[in-house]
Regions:
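A beta-rich soluble binding module of mature secreted/lumenal proteins
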Residues: 15, 20-168
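Bacterial N-terminal signal peptides that target proteins for export
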Residues: 1-11
Length: 168
């Protein structure tokens, strides 16, 4: 066996072991819970992004919004928009479709912006009047606080951040 093949084999085995271990669930963090029910018709419409966990696909975005509309097919059209690097920046838009993944609660969706990749969209907190929502995904890598209005009062935002901390 050549040295290259030997080292490549060790490298490949190490990658397999590391990736296998990374998929083992963390027992210390409880499973993320979604809200008990979402009336999709009330959830549709425009939402403003108030806060988020930073992510690569919104880098440089300012004034982000999400617009949800129901299509005849039953899918939900998702239109995300932001201005790049400030309020007068170039408009950036991403359009995708979402399917309800849990018909019991309507709180778990699968969103697809480009084929074949789909992402989880879990509604983990929702105002009874549908004025704000917290959205995340099972691994807690992404999170957004959304509001029906462009601004949120400081106390409500503080309360929502505390809810997020309590959810782990």
């Amino acid at each position: 066996m050549t040295i290259f093949v030997k080292y490549f084999s060790y490298f490949f085995l190490t990658i397999l072991l590391v990736s296998g271990c990374s998929s083992i669930p963390n027992k210390a963090t409880p499973e993320l819970q979604v809200v008990s029910y979402v009336d999709i018709e009330r959830y549709l419409g425009k939402w403003y992004e108030i806060a988020l966990y930073p992510n690569w696909f919104e880098k440089g975005c300012f004034g982000s919004t999400a617009y949800y509309e129901k299509l005849e097919s039953g899918q939900i059209r998702v239109t995300n928009q932001c201005r790049m690097h400030g309020p007068e920046g170039e408009l950036n838009e991403a359009i995708g479709n979402a399917d309800i993944a849990d018909n019991k609660t309507n709180a778990k969706l699968k969103v697809q912006f480009f084929w074949p990749f789909k992402g989880d969209y879990w509604i983990i907190d929702l105002d009874k009047d549908y004025q704000y929502a917290i959205v995340s995904e099972p691994d807690r890598q992404y999170l957004w606080i959304l509001s029906r209005s462009q601004n949120m009062d400081v106390q409500t935002l503080k309360t929502l951040k505390e809810k997020i901390r309590n959810k782990g």
